[in-house]
Amino acid sequence: MTILSDVKALGQQIWLDNLSRSLVQSGELAQMLKQGVCGVTSNPAIFQKAFAGDALYADEVAALKQQDLSPKQRYETMAVADVRAACGICLAEHESTGGKTGFVSLEVSPELSKDAQGTVEEARRLYAAIGCKNAMIKVPATDAGIDALETLVSDGISVNLTLLFSRVQTLKAYAAYARGIAKRLAAGQSVAHIHVVASFFISRVDGALDTTLPDHLKGKIAIALAKAAYQDWEQYFTTPEFAALEAQGANRVQLLWASTGVKNPAYPDTLYVDNLIGAHTVNTVPDATLKAFIDHGTAKATLTEGVEEAQAQLAETAALGIDVETLANRLQEDGLKQFEEAFEKLLAPLV
C-alpha cells in the first residue's frame, strides 16, 4: 500500500500530468500505475517538451517528414500513438473500476478554442483515431468549448474540460453536461460509460494574486476557491434534477485539480495536493509533485475542512477590490495563449 492507495480510499484519483514515448516504453508509466496513479493528462506544452527532449521520436519524425502530411498531421500521428499506448497501459485500471478510472486525455488544437463546431469535429476525429474506450478528449472551457461539451456528451464521448478558473463557468459546464446526457437518454442511448472531468486550475490563481495580497492571504486563495467550487459541485449534483439523470445511469462530473505543481518555492511542494483531497475528485500532478507527495505528502480528506474560513478569505479578497471572476477570465485567456504558443513551437520542427 502506498499513500496513493490511501488517497484513492478517500475517493480521489491521482493522475499523472505528463506523457512521452519514453515514459510509456520504459515501463515507468506502468510502474506508476502499480503505485496507485489512476490516469494520465497531456496538453500541447507537455507534447512540445516531449518532442523536443525525447530521442525516441527522432526516427518517426524523420519518417513522417518523408510523407505528404501537414505539420499538424505529423504531430497528431505521434500524439495519438502515445495516447493509445498509454490507454493500453491504463486499461486494466479502467476495467477494474467498471470504467470509472484509467483515462488518458488528448487535447484538441488550441486554435479551435473559440470554435464550437470545429472543436466537435476534431474531438470526434481524435476519439475515433485513438480507438480506446478509456480515451478522454480535452476541450478548453471557453463558451464555445462548453457548447462543444454538450454535443460530445450526447455523442457518448468522455471529455476533460480544461482551463477552468471560474466557479460561474464551471456551473455552466455542469448544466451543458446535463443537457448532453438528457439528449442522449431521450434518444434511448446508454450514458453509463460517459465520464467528464472539469479541470479547475489552482497554482496560477495564487501566482496572479500573491503580489497584491496581504501576507496572511498569500498562498490561500486558490485553495479557498477550490473549496468553494467543491461546495458548488455538491449542491449541483445532489439536486432532484440531476438525481433523475443519475437514476438512468448518468455519472457525476468530477472536479479535477490541475496546475497543482507549486510555482512559488516558498510554499510546501505538496501544498496543492495535501489540501485538496476529497471524494469524487481527481488531482493531476507533474512528476516532481507526484514524487514529493509519495515521499512526504499527507492523505487526509481536507477538501471539506475549513470551508467557512475559505469563504471568509474569498470575502476579504473581494473587499480588497479583487474580482476573482474577472481574474478567472484573464487567466483563461493567458492559458489559451500559452497553449497556442506551445502548439506553434511543437509544430515548427515538424514542417
Swiss-Prot record:
GO terms for cellular component: cytoplasm. GO terms for molecular function: transaldolase activity. Pfam families: TAL_FSA. Its EC number is 2.2.1.2. One of its GO terms (biological process) is pentose-phosphate shunt. Belongs to the transaldolase family. Type 2 subfamily. This is Transaldolase. The lineage of its organism: Bacteria, Pseudomonadati, Pseudomonadota, Betaproteobacteria, Neisseriales. The gene is tal.
